[in-house]
């Protein structure tokens, strides 16, 4: 019997080690940056500070860490160029996706980690719900801001990793996040196309002859190995005589480019300050945290997963123990009837332990205990 209790306690200790943040954790929010390396993009991004960014979270009370970022799927280039043109229609294969990982990548991918603010577990859980709503609202990747140089009016807003991060800062601040200090600053990339006119929405753009001709020419452009993004935009501007058709989440816009049509800036960007306003935070009516091994979208109910792992291991152990013990008692010890049950007297007193054990498992699997720390479902 003592061996059974020791084994159960061992399994409980394993279950406790795969937990999430607790209600008492103080959590630090990190601004993560990773350079877009020359080895991948060549000189296309030469002379620019091009970074991928994300948000990291770590507990000051434990070794728990999390990472959330927004990426172009399958890549940034696919958000600019269509997959193909077939039967008189432009076909795209592009989307934007919020990724969640239950650890911060420590392989050296992130070149910079800056502490921004502290939050608690309640804010973290609400943020995860907000992140899913963000991705349902903005499920595409749009590289460019489009700005009217005459009026300084933003005509099209980019939807990139930095936009997600700054929207995340805004959500966390309005939910009650506290800055590490009053002098926190952070910088980001901003890619801008300039026009001096209003942009024109193109009706039925995917089958529009002029739009198709534009993207056929785009697909046929051979980018030299030493081409920079500035040079590429200038080449496109000359090729298309200032008319640029921009694809944005199923829609097309005719953008008449300015004489200096492009800029790539890496500069300080303001963080949210002032009065907090929860009306800025849009959440889904219900949230379910669903972990995916390929980081498919959001979120990980680690307590629930741990609970079911515990159940499976415990039932497997019990089955093997009973079947093995019965076989040994029957064929080696030549017992019969109820005496076949291994440690029969000990098992008869196990009812209370089983009841308590299932109560514990239920609390871990459902997060139903009062004051528990199971994630709200997203």
Swiss-Prot record:
InterPro entries: Autophagy-rel_prot_27 (IPR018939), CLN5 (IPR026138). GO terms for biological process: lysosome organization. The chain crosses the membrane at residues 308-328. Keywords: Glycoprotein, Membrane, Signal, Transmembrane, Transmembrane helix. It is found in: Membrane. Pfam families: ATG27 (PF09451), CLN5 (PF15014). Its main location: membrane. GO terms for molecular function: hydrolase activity, acting on glycosyl bonds. Residues 1-20 form the signal peptide. It is a single-pass membrane protein. Glycans are attached at residues 63, 93, 135, 181, 220, 226, 254, 280. One of its GO terms (cellular component) is lysosomal membrane. Belongs to the CLN5 family. PANTHER family: CEROID-LIPOFUSCINOSIS, NEURONAL 5 (PTHR15380), CLN5-LIKE PROTEIN 1-RELATED (PTHR15380:SF1). This is Cln5-like protein 1. The lineage of its organism: Eukaryota, Amoebozoa, Evosea, Eumycetozoa, Dictyostelia.
């Amino acid at each position: 019997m003592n061996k059974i209790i020791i084994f159960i306690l061992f399994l409980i200790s394993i279950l406790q080690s795969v937990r999430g943040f607790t209600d008492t954790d103080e959590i630090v929010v990190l601004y993560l940056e990773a350079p877009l390396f020359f080895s991948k993009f060549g000189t296309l991004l030469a002379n620019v500070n091009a970074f991928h960014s994300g948000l990291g979270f770590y507990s000051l009370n434990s070794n728990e860490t999390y990472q959330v970022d927004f990426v172009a799927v399958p890549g940034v280039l696919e958000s600019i160029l269509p997959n193909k043109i077939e039967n008189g229609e432009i076909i795209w294969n592009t989307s934007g996706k919020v990724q969640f990982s239950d650890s911060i990548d420590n392989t050296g991918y992130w070149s910079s980690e800056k502490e921004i603010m502290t939050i608690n577990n309640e804010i973290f859980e609400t943020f995860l719900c907000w992140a899913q709503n963000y991705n349902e609202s903005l499920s595409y990747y749009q590289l460019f801001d489009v700005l009217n140089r005459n009026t300084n009016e933003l005509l099209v807003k980019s939807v990139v990793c930095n936009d997600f991060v700054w929207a995340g800062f805004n959500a966390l601040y309005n939910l009650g996040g506290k800055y590490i200090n009053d002098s926190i600053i952070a910088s980001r990339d901003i890619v801008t196309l300039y026009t001096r006119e209003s942009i024109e929405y193109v009706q039925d753009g995917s089958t529009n002859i002029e739009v198709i001709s534009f993207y056929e020419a785009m697909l046929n452009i051979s980018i030299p190995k030493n081409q920079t993004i500035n040079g590429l935009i200038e080449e496109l501007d000359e090729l298309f005589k200032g008319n640029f058709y921009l694809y944005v989440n199923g829609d097309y816009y005719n953008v008449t480019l300015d004489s200096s049509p492009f800029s790539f800036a890496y500069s300080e960007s303001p963080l949210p300050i002032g009065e907090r306003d929860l009306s800025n935070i849009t959440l889904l009516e219900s949230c379910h945290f669903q972990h995916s091994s390929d980081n498919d979208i959001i979120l990980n109910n680690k307590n629930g997963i741990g609970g079911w792992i515990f159940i499976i291991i415990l039932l497997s152990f019990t089955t093997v123990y009973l079947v093995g013990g019965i076989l040994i008692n029957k064929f080696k010890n030549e017992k019969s009837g109820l005496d076949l049950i291994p440690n029969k007297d000990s098992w008869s007193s196990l009812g209370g332990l089983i009841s308590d054990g299932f109560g514990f498992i239920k609390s871990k699997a459902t997060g139903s205990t009062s004051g528990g720390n199971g994630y709200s479902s997203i």
